[in-house]
C-alpha cells in the first residue's frame, strides 16, 4: 500500500514522502495513529492544502519535545529483578517495565517511543533510545540488577559475574590448601612431615 507521510517516520521517510508499506503496518500503525494518508489522488490534494499547517505544528511539537528530551537524556533507570547466580533473569525486562520506571521518575512516554530490540534477560546495563518526537531522540541507561547495592557496583563498572567466579576460585584454593595443612600441628611436626615428604620424593 502507498501512503503519504504526515510526519517523519524513522527508517521510512520524511513528511510528504510517498512510500510503499505493508497493508498491516499501514492500517494498524500509520493510518491509525494519524501519521499518514492513503496515497490517493484526493489525499494528495488534501495534503498539499494542509502541508503548511503540518509544518508549523511540527516545529512547535519539536520544540516541546526538545525540552522533554533534556529531562530524559542521560537518565539511569534501575530495575530490580530476581536472577540466577549466572545473572540470567527469572523472566525479562520489557518496554512496559521501562515505561513504568520512567513514569515513577515523573516522565511520561508511550511504549512505541522506547526502542528495545528484544526483552532484557540478564543483569547488566543497556543504553536505549527514546523517540520523544520523530526528529528528537533521547538516551537512557537501563541498569538491571538483583539489588540496589549490585546496581551501584554495575554502574561503577564492576564485573559481577567475574567477582563471583574469583570468590569461588579463592574458596576452592583455600579448601585445597587445607587438605595439606593441619593448623593444630606443632612446628616440629610440620618440619618432620616436610622432611619425610622430601625423603620420599628422593
Swiss-Prot record:
Q: Please verify whether the record's keywords include rRNA-binding.
A: yes
Asked whether the keyword rRNA-binding is assigned, the reply is yes
For the biological process aspect of GO, one term held by this record is: translation
Belongs to which family?
Answer: Belongs to the bacterial ribosomal protein bL9 family.
- Organism from which the protein derives: Nitrobacter hamburgensis (strain DSM 10229 / NCIMB 13809 / X14)
Ranges annotated as biased composition (Acidic residues): 181-191
Instruction: Give the gene symbol.
Output: rplI
Q: Which domain of life is it from?
A: Bacteria
Which SUPFAM superfamilies does the entry mention? L9 N-domain-like, Ribosomal protein L9 C-domain
InterPro entries xref list: Ribosomal_bL9 (IPR000244), Ribosomal_bL9/RNase_H1_N (IPR009027), Ribosomal_bL9_bac/chp (IPR020594), Ribosomal_bL9_C (IPR020069), Ribosomal_bL9_C_sf (IPR036791), Ribosomal_bL9_N (IPR020070), Ribosomal_bL9_N_sf (IPR036935)
Any one annotated GO CC term: ribonucleoprotein complex
UniProt xrefs under Pfam families: Ribosomal_L9_C, Ribosomal_L9_N
According to the UniProt entry, its GO molecular function terms are:
rRNA binding; structural constituent of ribosome
The record's section on HAMAP family has: Ribosomal_bL9
Q: Which UniProt keywords apply?
A: Ribonucleoprotein, Ribosomal protein, RNA-binding, rRNA-binding
Name of the protein in question = Large ribosomal subunit protein bL9
Chain residue ranges for the region called Disordered: 177-202
What this chain does, per the entry, is described as:
Binds to the 23S rRNA.
Amino acid at each position: 500500500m502507498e501512503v503519504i507521510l504526515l510526519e517523519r517516520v524513522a527508517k521510512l521517510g520524511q513528511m510528504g514522502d510517498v512510500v510503499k508499506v505493508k497493508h498491516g503496518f499501514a492500517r494498524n500503525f500509520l493510518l491509525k495513529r494519524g501519521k499518514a494518508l492513503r496515497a490517493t489522488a484526493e489525499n494528495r490534494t488534501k495534503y498539499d492544502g494542509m502541508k503548511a499547517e503540518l509544518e508549523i505544528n511540527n516545529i512547535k511539537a519539536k520544540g516541546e519535545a526538545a525540552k522533554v528530551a533534556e529531562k530524559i537524556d542521560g537518565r539511569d533507570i534501575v530495575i530490580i529483578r530476581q536472577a540466577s547466580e549466572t545473572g540470567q533473569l527469572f523472566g525479562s525486562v520489557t518496554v512496559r517495565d521501562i515505561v513504568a520506571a520512567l513514569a515513577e521518575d515523573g516522565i511520561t512516554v508511550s511504549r512505541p517511543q522506547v526502542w528495545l530490540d528484544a526483552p532484557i534477560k540478564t543483569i547488566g546495563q543497556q543504553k536505549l533510545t527514546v523517540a520523544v518526537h520523530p526528529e528528537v531522540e533521547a538516551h537512557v541507561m537501563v541498569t538491571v540488577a538483583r539489588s540496589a547495592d549490585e546496581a551501584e557496583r554495575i554502574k561503577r563498572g564492576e564485573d559481577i559475574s567475574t567477582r563471583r567466579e574469583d570468590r569461588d576460585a579463592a574458596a576452592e584454593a583455600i579448601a585445597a590448601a587445607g587438605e595439606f595443612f593441619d593448623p593444630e600441628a606443632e612446628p616440629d611436626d610440620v618440619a618432620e612431615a616436610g622432611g619425610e615428604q622430601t625423603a620420599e620424593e628422593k
